């Protein structure tokens, strides 16, 4: 998977969430849950991936640009998201 991102956004994400966009490639993508972010009309479709990294569920907001995954946000999942999308969710 080829990743891309805005460098200023990556630095802001590290500051806010302590997670670097470069770590997104180490998520368990094979077992991820994907949802479209339809909260508003964006200029291009956005998606959420809920995937494990170690013992923690993480959330990646991204869009697709050709064959590349453009990372928009990367953070640990909140309690509600863990219940809904975590490994023990049904």
Locate the predicted segments by residue.
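Ribonuclease/tRNase effector modules and their secretory precursors
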Residues: 1-90
């Amino acid at each position: 998977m080829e990743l891309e991102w805005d460098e200023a956004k990556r630095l802001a994400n590290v500051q806010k969430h302590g997670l670097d966009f470069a770590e997104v490639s180490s998520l368990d993508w094979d077992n991820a849950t994907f949802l479209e972010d339809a909260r508003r009309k964006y200029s291009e479709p956005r998606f959420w991936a809920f995937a494990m990294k170690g013992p923690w569920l993480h959330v990646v907001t991204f869009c697709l640009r050709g064959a590349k995954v453009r990372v928009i946000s990367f953070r640990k999942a909140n309690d509600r998201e863990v219940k809904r999308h975590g490994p023990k969710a049904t």
